[in-house]
Amino acid sequence: MKTIKEKVKESFEMLKTEFGYKNAMQAPKIQKVIVSSGVGSIKDKKKIDLVEDRLSKITGQKPARKGAKISIASFKVRQGDIVGMQITLRGARMYDFLDRLINLALPRTKDFRGISSNGIDGMGNYSFGIKENTIFPECSDEELKDVFGMAVTVVTNVKNPKETKAFLTHLGFPFKKVETKEIKEKPKREKKPKAE
């Protein structure tokens, strides 16, 4: 099976006829992958450490703690309180994470039928959510009691949603297959002339 890195190198040859690339510098590339997660209870120090530990196991890199930008009295959040974690992956770690995500983690999701392509924006970014961190093999069965979700953003150099989807499909992202149903037209009724 080819790795994501090998597929990225092949992307120029695979997509040049469809999108009219003239040289290899126009070929799409993945620039970075951002993985982020909220910590839930900000007062629970154990939960913050737990999320940090598991994200570092999943990605192979220590996450940066993100503090609240403003104080919100109704949520009892003060400016600077830790509310989430974020990791930016580049290079070899990025490709390793994507390989594990596509080939191991996503197929382990319960009732998995593909990921939605609605998260593709006009700037070449694709964002999607993962409901449970336990789909990754790094999170063992002993750790099932504290499950959290995460958001993954794949940043590419493509500036067109159609091109982005074709590139990510070539890399092996399992997008949902949209079934198009034929819409039957209702027969038109003939209008009866009004009686005078």
Regions found by a protein language model. Give the residues of each.
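Ribosome-associated RNA-binding proteins
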Residues: 1-196
